[in-house]
Amino acid sequence: MKSNFIEKNNTEKSIWCSPQEIMAADGMPGSVAGVHYRANVQGWTKQKKEGVKGGKAVEYDVMSMPTKEREQVIAHLGLSTPDTGAQANEKQDSSELINKLTTTLINMIEELEPDEARKALKLLSKGGLLALMPLVFNEQKLYSFIGFSQQSIQTLMMLDALPEEKRKEILSKYGIHEQESVVVPSQEPQEVKKAV
């Protein structure tokens, strides 16, 4: 039978807790026997507790627990491990970045004309942030939101990657001619009178 007891000199990165401390954490068993049972089932590392007469008291290494239990006990103890400290820093960096993005977007939205704001809202509601900020997200996903099939998107990407002359040659075979500049009507549209 495998023993979970370890030597004292291997405990540098360990956090040792009594079963009573462990059972006080959220989501942990409500009795000492329950803590011992879970520790045996999950294979937590244990050691004899120092200074206890009779030598039957044990304490468990929190770092040997599965992630869920470990996080619950560490939170209960109010401790921070190197892992949780790094995660906290990463969350803080992410939170600061999101706050900065939010502020920037709000400032930009405040500068929009009412018509531009309506268009942006329509794009946002139809395609999400991807439609509003296509350069941030995958270009192929943007085209699929607009309604292009995957095959059309791939064809478009392939044609776009070709040299201009080759692209014109291929498109001309299908009667499609690229326009060099903006097309402007040669005359103003005539008003149409409705027949009564």
From Swiss-Prot:
What is the induction note for this entry?
Answer: Expressed in the early phase of the viral replicative cycle. When present at high concentration, negatively regulates its own expression by binding to O3 (PcM promoter). PcM promoter, and thus Repc expression, is blocked by Ner. The host SsrA, the ClpXP host protease that degrades Repressor c protein, the Lon protease, and the stationary phase-specific sigma factor RpoS are all influencing Mu repression in response to either temperature or stationary growth phase.
Give the UniProt subcellular location, in the record's own words. Host cytoplasm
User: What does the annotation give as the result of altering V183S?
Assistant: Resistant to ClpX-ClpP degradation
Q: Which InterPro entries match?
A: DNA-bd_dom_put_sf (IPR009061), Mu-type_HTH (IPR003314), WH-like_DNA-bd_sf (IPR036388)
> Which residue range or ranges hold the HTH Mu-type domain?
13-81
One molecular function GO term is: DNA binding
Against Pfam families, the record matches this protein to: HTH_Tnp_Mu_1 (PF02316)
Q: Where is this region: Recognition by host ClpX-ClpP?
A: 192-196
Q: Spell out the post-translational modification annotation for this entry.
A: C-terminally truncated forms act as exceptionally stable repressors that prevent prophage induction.
Coiled-coil spans are none
Keywords on this record? DNA-binding, Early protein, Host cytoplasm, Host-virus interaction, Latency-replication decision, Repressor, Transcription, Transcription regulation, Viral latency, Viral latency initiation and maintenance
According to its UniProt entry, what is the function of this protein?
A: Promotes latency by binding operators O1 and O2 in the enhancer/operator region, thereby repressing the transcription from the Pe (early) promoter and blocking the expression of the genes required for replication (lytic growth). Competes with DDE-recombinase A for binding to the internal activation sequence (IAS), which overlaps O1 and O2. The outcome of this competition determines if the virus enters latency or starts replication. Makes the cell immune to superinfection by repressing genes expression of any subsequent incoming viral genome.
What is written about domains in the entry's comments? The winged HTH N-terminal domain cooperatively binds to three operators O1, O2, and O3 with respectively 3, 4 and 2 binding sites. The C-terminal domain (CTD) regulates DNA binding by the N-terminal domain and degradation by ClpX-ClpP protease.
**UniProt record similarity statement:** Belongs to the mulikevirus repressor c protein family.
| Quaternary context | Homodimer. Three homodimers assemble as a homohexamer.
Protein name as catalogued: Repressor protein c
Give the originating organism: Escherichia phage Mu (Bacteriophage Mu)
